[in-house]
Structure formats: C-alpha cells, structure tokens
Amino acid sequence: MISASALNSELINKIAQDFAQATGLAVVVVNIHGDEISELFNFTPFCQLMRQHPQHSTRCRMSDRCGGLEASKSDQPCIYRCHAGLTDFSIPLVIAGHLVGFVLCGQVRLSNDVELVNILNVDDRWQADPELLNEFRNVPEMDYSRVIASADLLKLIVENCLKKQLNFVVIKDNPQQSEANKTTRGPTPHDSKMKKALRYIDAHLSDDLRLEDVASHVYLSPYYFSKLFKKYQGIGFNAWVNRQRMVSARELLCHSDWSIASIARNLGFSQTSYFCKVFRQTYQVTPQAYRQQINENSHPPSL
C-alpha cells in the first residue's frame, strides 16, 4: 500500500510517458525494493510476458533493484545487461538527500558488440519457452551511442525536473503493521515521526545506520527515540535494522548472483564474517548453505 507520503504520481507518469514516446525505450519507476510505482510505458511484449511469469518476474524485479543499486553508488546512470540479456539503464532518484527509488529504461538489444555490466548472471532457462524466444527476437535493436545519449538525457530530466518538483517520498508501508496499528490504536502525534524514521532506515540499509542519526532525522533525543521505537515496533532499533537487512539479504541470495561479500557490503556490513553470523542467527543456516539450498530446489534433476 502506498503511504500518504507519496510522490506526485501524475508528474512521474507524465515524464516517463513522454520520455518513452520520444526515445522508443521502455520506462518504469521503481522504489528501492524494485517494486513498480509508476505505470509501465512502452514495455516490449517479451518483457510483459516475462513479468507475468512467477519465477521470471522475480528475477526481473531483482534485476531492477540491483541495477538501481549499482547506479546509486556513483549517482550516475548505469548501463547494464539484465538477467534475460537485454540492455537497460537506471537513474537513481534521490529526494531531499534520500535514495527513494530508480528510474529504469531500456529493453533493447544492442546492434553493436559492447561489453556491459551483467547486473545478474544471464539466465537462459526462459529460452525453453518458444513464445518467449520468438518475442525476444522481436525486441528492437539500438546503437550503443544512442543508449548513452538517452541515459544522459534522462539524467538531466530527473535532476532538473523531477527532483526539484517532488517534495514527498514513495514507500511501501508494511500492510500487516498498518492494519495492526489501525486495530489497536488511533493515530498519535508520533505516528508521522515513526513513518519518517522507518523510511529513513529503509533507504539507508547500506549505510552505517546509527540510532543517533535516525533520532536526529526526526528531531527526537536518542533516549526518547529508542523508547518510542521499541514501543512502536516491538523490538529495539538495532534488532529491527538487522531484521530488515536479513530480509533483503535473503532476497539477494535467492534472486541475485552477487557474492556474499558484495551482499554484506551493500547491506551496510563492513565485515562479511559478522554478516554471516547475523544471518545464521536469524535463519539457522549460513548464507552459502541457504543459497545452495535455493539453487538445488530451483534446479530439479533431469530425468
């Protein structure tokens, strides 16, 4: 559910639609989890079919997220090859100093041979589907120089139009938490501060998150914020942050090809060994063993 603190969806959709029509590229805006928060513009039939398939759509979502995270590291456009082998690029969307999502474009095949970042290892299992294979061959080709020019243009549009006119942040509220809050109590003066704090945490999981910094962000003393946070969430600040990081870690282990060290680093852990320790405490299995279990379950032995 989109919270009341939402981006101007009309503005987002207008810009995305105009850019898609002008360039012939597919465009979508996603939040930091890879969930779509705009309409889908100019999507190829191939990508539409892929996103309708439960397993393939999960890889699409993770590809969107990983591509966005790569772009956010340098705050520059990142041109990459998606899990299905198409060329995409992403632009980080930073509002009021906070990473809130990514603008993703592409869904083209390059007409010239260029070495690109493989954001996830190319997964060719979809090629067993004749319909998908046929639609892939119909995906339009584009010269790499035109992709670069399009990425640079979109960067300018995001910087000079989108960011300057947006005052709010898109997040996906936790539905269970929202319903629980509705049934157990009415709104309180601190509800908005807690939502703001949770948004900040969500957007900074890859940073060195300290309670003092989040408390300062919502204009509360660390002591009072600590008590308030535990009252609202039921657990302490550090435990909550680690839990959110472990949820993201499990998704990345399932659906990305990043090394365990890369996952740890992108989730704010300076030491891989500590990341592995927290993961094992949470799920009673090491990250490596968890990924191996997932791979074994998704690759049944051939007859």
Curated annotation (Swiss-Prot):
Disruption phenotype: Increases expression of the entire cob operon about 90-fold irrespective of the growth medium; expression retains its sensitivity to vitamin B12 repression. Cells lacking this gene are defective in aerobic and anaerobic degradation of propanediol. GO terms for molecular function: DNA-binding transcription factor activity; sequence-specific DNA binding. Pathway: Cofactor biosynthesis; adenosylcobalamin biosynthesis [regulation]; Polyol metabolism; 1,2-propanediol degradation [regulation]. SMART domains: HTH_ARAC (SM00342). Keywords: Activator, Cobalamin biosynthesis, DNA-binding, Glycerol metabolism, Transcription, Transcription regulation. The keyword Transcription applies. Residues 212-233, 260-283 bind DNA. Residues 195-293 form the HTH araC/xylS-type domain. One of its GO terms (biological process) is propanediol catabolic process. The keyword Transcription applies. PROSITE patterns: HTH_ARAC_FAMILY_1, HTH_ARAC_FAMILY_2. Positive regulatory protein of pdu and cob operons. Positively autoregulates its own expression. PANTHER family: ARAC-FAMILY TRANSCRIPTIONAL REGULATOR (PTHR43280), REGULATORY PROTEIN POCR (PTHR43280:SF10). This is Regulatory protein PocR. The lineage of its organism: Bacteria, Pseudomonadati, Pseudomonadota, Gammaproteobacteria, Enterobacterales.
